[in-house]
Design a protein with these regions (language model features):
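Flexible, glycine/charged-enriched surface loops at secondary-structure junctions
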Residues: 19-20, 48, 161-164, 247-261, ...
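A non-catalytic alpha/beta surface segment that caps or lines the substrate-entry region
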Residues: 22-70, 74-76, 80, 90
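Active-site metal-coordination/substrate-binding segment of hydrolases
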Residues: 67-164, 189
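Short pre-catalytic strand/loop immediately N-terminal to key active-site residues, enriched for Gly-Thr
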Residues: 130-138, 344-348, 378-379
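His/Asp/Glu-rich mid-to-C-terminal helical/loop segments that flank catalytic regions of hydrolases
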Residues: 157, 232-249, 284-298, 332, ...
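Active-site-adjacent substrate-binding region
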Residues: 236-252, 259-261, 308, 318-366
Length: 407
């Protein structure tokens, strides 16, 4: 089966995770894809494929004769889609020989346009897969799953020599808990790659340090006509707090620049809540960002009274760069493999995180590879058939390279 054919099957399975669930996985529907993947792995000859009670899929292919002393290499992707935009009833549309211009997305009123996404003309002539404008496409990360599955099928059917190969598919990556219950020992790899990036040719081993902040503002409500020097409007205090933070938002930053991102805000005069994510590649600057937020809270409590603003900060993940630097062969081999299939390698920091960032600190060095997916997490998400084929080839070449390496 071709990569894009698998992909089209996978995206039709609703697998969105949930921020509001404490169960593992956060949504039972993720098992629907997990069970299908196990069935497909069995069908291509990976008889030990299994899914555990927490919805983690594990499988391995034993080394071929003569490659038993090669490193065990793993490939990992996640099954869930983002909960922030619908992933239900995905209706992918294939556009052959894309002209590089506007694409009307079904009857949604949305248009995929180079005016908003200037990379689109570079995809001219390729076969584009888009949404109908009402859902995500699910390329994040079902493109990665399809690429891994196709590569493993080809390794087996073409009798390519290889060291031990380890395959893992995780739940709940989009809500930050994809690595929480990942069993590194059971997975069995010496090194791994997540296949969860953007454009084909992306190779990433630096990611944000990440934290989440929960702000609760406790106001004092009284009749507006009798509120002089008495009322504390929680909504206005919340707005004041936001105004005290640097103007370093996702829309104003790029590359190695970090940010404060207000993701949710709700409330009334009596009580308001705000959710922030805080990101930076530098651990020192990340510490300073937390201090900036704490200082703003302190100033507001001095102004409006102790306990007016409550702030809880929770660390989420760390920059994996320190764990990858001793294993730079992972990056060097990926760069060489990309060049050999005509891709221009783009080694750049991830403005986000992956399961691999967490796994790297759990003893499994795990940089990230592109999947050919663009504009993820919303209705403008799209991939190209050609891009996914290149990403599949990249996985195959990495398997080939490590079949010639010794531990």
């Amino acid at each position: 089966m071709k990569t894009y054919e698998r992909f089209l099957n996978y995206v039709r399975i609703h697998t969105a995770s949930s921020e509001d669930s404490s169960s593992v996985p956060t949504t039972e529907r993720q098992f629907d894809l997990a069970k299908l993947l196990v069935k497909e792995l069995h069908a291509i000859g990976v008889e030990n494929a299994r899914v555990d009670d927490k919805c983690y899929v594990y499988a391995s292919v034993a080394a071929t004769p003569g490659c038993e002393n090669c490193p065990a290499i793993g490939f990992i992707a996640h099954m869930d889609t983002v909960p922030d935009f619908s992933g239900e009833n995905v209706q992918p549309r294939i556009i052959e020989n894309y002209d590089g211009g506007d694409v009307v997305l079904g009857t949604s009123g949305r248009v995929l346009s180079p005016k908003k996404l200037p990379h689109l003309p570079s995809l001219k002539g390729k076969t584009l897969i888009v949404t109908d404008g009402t859902t995500v496409l699910g390329g994040d990360d079902k493109a990665g799953i399809a690429e891994i599955m196709t590569a493993i099928e080809r390794v087996i059917s073409e009798n390519r020599p290889h060291g031990k190969l380890c395959i893992g598919f995780t739940p709940d990556e989009e809500v930050g808990s994809g690595a929480d219950n990942f069993n590194v020992a059971e997975f069995g790899a010496d090194f791994a790659y997540t296949v969860d990036g953007g454009a084909e040719g992306e190779i990433e081993y630096e990611n944000f340090n990440a934290a989440a902040a929960k702000i609760v503002v406790n106001g004092f409500n009284i009749h507006p006509g009798d509120s002089k020097n008495k009322m504390i409007n929680a909504l206005l205090v919340a707005m004041e707090l936001n105004s005290m933070l640097p103007d370093e938002t996702p829309a104003n930053t790029e590359g190695y620049e970090g940010f404060f991102h207000l993701t949710d805000m709700s409330g009334n005069v009596e009580r308001a809540e705000m959710d922030y994510i805080i990101r930076d590649h530098s651990e020192a600057i990340m510490t300073a960002r937390k201090a900036t937020l704490a200082h703003a809270v302190k100033i507001l409590n001095e102004k409006y009274g102790s306990g007016t603003v409550e702030c809880t900060v929770r660390d989420q993940y760390l920059n994996m760069v320190e764990k990858i630097r001793p294993c730079m062969h992972l990056i060097d081999n990926a760069v060489e493999a990309a060049k050999s299939i005509g891709l221009v390698p783009k080694v750049a920091p991830i403005r986000g995180g992956t399961d691999g960032a967490r796994l790297s600190f759990m003893g499994l060095p795990c940089p990230n590879l592109g999947t050919g997916d663009f504009a993820c997490h919303g209705p403008y998400e799209h991939v190209t058939v050609e891009g996914m084929e290149k990403c599949t080839e990249l996985v195959l070449l990495l398997i080939d390279k490590y079949s010639k390496a010794a531990k």
